[in-house]
């Protein structure tokens, strides 16, 4: 039963990864068309770095492209500002955990 569960988890992860690649390709096409208007091309933004000014510029992680995650921050003056950082969404963290676990088991 455990082997079946691991195999199903791996299949779900692989399907998620392949669909993510297709989505990332579409995002890349949109990003390239936007960047064509800019004179200089910026490098991608690493994990845990700020992406407030460039929400589509996050780097690619081990399996998935990082996503720009935003939150509203209230300063000491009571002013609300939006702060964003590149990170891995929870469902993708779970997929990476399953793949890592599968690699440890199957070599």
Swiss-Prot record:
Q: Which InterPro entries match?
A: Spider_toxin_CSTX_knottin (IPR019553), Spider_toxin_CSTX_Knottin_CS (IPR011142)
Which named protein is this?
Answer: U1-lycotoxin-Ls1p
Q: Which GO terms describe its molecular function?
A: toxin activity
Q: Entry's PROSITE patterns? A: SPIDER_CSTX
- Please verify whether the record's keywords include NAD: no
Q: Which residues form the propeptide?
A: 21-41
Q: What is the tissue specificity?
A: Expressed by the venom gland.
Q: Is-annotated flag, keyword Disulfide bond?
A: yes
Q: Which cysteines are joined by disulfide bonds?
A: 44-59, 51-68, 58-86, 70-84
The stretch of residues making up the signal peptide is: 1-20
User: Which keywords belong to this entry?
Assistant: Disulfide bond, Knottin, Secreted, Signal, Toxin
Question: What superkingdom does the record give?
Answer: Eukaryota
- One Pfam family per UniProt: Toxin_35
Q: What family does this chain come from, according to its entry?
A: Belongs to the neurotoxin 19 (CSTX) family. 04 (U1-Lctx) subfamily.
Cellular-component GO terms for this entry: extracellular region
State its location(s): Secreted
Q: What is its main location?
A: secreted
Q: What is known of its domains?
A: The presence of a 'disulfide through disulfide knot' structurally defines this protein as a knottin.
